[in-house]
């Protein structure tokens, strides 16, 4: 019997519908024929906080305990979101069932999706054959095609390793640097691998804007029988006036040294990735990045858009069968 683990309830339901057959609903999972389908709640399992390491005195905020580094004995914990502990027990119980002989990773098709599945497997401590269901659309045909072409989970080990490295780097920098700055400056600070450099870039840009001193410049624009020839910016007014006198002199003539005509093909614009869409929604409609992602996630779960958290600008061959809108 296969146990298919999706990242969230709505995706699990879509997969169960695509599998087809008689469906029995249970608390935290559904059974469809000989398949079990369950789901996480995002990051159901995460790295433990320093104060949760009982064999270390890391609960006390002190410079004497820094740096904190659990390597190689990293510990995991179930997330604190509402219902996380209950759903974890459901998933863990299903994974340990004797009639479950295969685990299917159906979490989101990206690095974090891979991390969510691997962390659950690690924390539960089971060792069973694992396959990867890689699908970016919740259309039933797309899910069925993905089920028929699953690969061994070991082929995604590099993706899993990158997720683990990212998580541990964030933990080490965040836990150590946040405590260090807070203790040194006697105030609560949060320092992050991504957050802090990003804030620094924003502050630097804000300072550049605040310290900007506008400087005048001059340009000479000459009308040319229906179009205009514009010169470069000039820092000195006298230079612009001298150029203007030359252009207006009776013996001055414009000459065309080279004219070229060629046929050019402009390809249609590429599809959006998440960042590009968030930029345009902010610029055109004033939407925050979070609101844009929430709207796109809702469209994805309604089978009206492909997986939103991607940097890819292309679709699969399945898009050829998508009806035109």
For each predicted feature, which ranges?
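Conserved small/polar residues in nucleotide/adenosyl-binding loops
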Residues: 314-319
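A short, conserved structural fragment
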Residues: 302-308
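C-terminal or mid-to-C-terminal helical accessory/interaction module adjacent to the motor/catalytic core
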Residues: 143-217
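Long, highly charged, low-complexity internal segments
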Residues: 34-36, 44-82, 93, 189-301
């Amino acid at each position: 019997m296969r146990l298919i683990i999706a990242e969230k309830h709505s995706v699990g339901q879509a997969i169960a519908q695509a599998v087809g057959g008689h469906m029995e609903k249970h608390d935290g999972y559904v059974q469809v024929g000989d398949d079990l389908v369950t789901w996480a709640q995002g990051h159901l399992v995460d790295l433990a906080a320093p104060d949760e390491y009982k064999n270390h005195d890391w609960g006390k905020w002190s410079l004497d305990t820094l740096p904190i580094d659990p390597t190689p004995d990293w510990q995991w914990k179930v997330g604190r979101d509402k219902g996380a502990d209950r759903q974890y027990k459901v998933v863990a119980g299903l994974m340990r069932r004797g009639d479950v002989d295969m685990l299917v990773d159906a979490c989101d098709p990206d690095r974090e999706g891979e991390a969510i599945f691997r962390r659950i497997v690690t924390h539960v401590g089971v060792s069973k054959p694992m396959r990867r269901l890689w699908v970016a659309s919740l259309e039933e045909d797309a899910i069925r095609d993905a089920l028929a072409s699953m690969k061994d989970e070991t082929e995604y080990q590099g993706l899993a390793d990158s997720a683990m490295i990212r998580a541990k780097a964030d933990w080490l920098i965040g836990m150590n640097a946040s405590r260090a700055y807070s203790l040194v400056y006697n105030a609560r600070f949060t320092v992050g691998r991504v957050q802090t450099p990003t804030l620094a870039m924003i502050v630097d840009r804000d300072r550049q804007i605040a310290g900007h001193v506008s400087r005048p410049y001059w340009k000479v624009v000459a009308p040319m029988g229906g179009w205009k020839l514009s010169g470069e910016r000039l820092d000195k007014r006298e230079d612009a006036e001298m150029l203007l006198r030359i252009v207006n002199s009776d013996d001055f003539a414009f000459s065309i040294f080279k004219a070229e005509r060629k046929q050019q093909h402009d390809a249609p614009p590429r599809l959006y990735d998440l960042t590009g869409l968030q930029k345009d929604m902010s610029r055109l409609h004033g939407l925050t990045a979070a609101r844009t992602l929430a709207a796109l996630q809702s469209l994805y779960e309604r089978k009206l858009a492909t997986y939103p958290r991607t940097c890819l600008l292309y679709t699969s061959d399945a898009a050829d069968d998508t009806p035109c809108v």
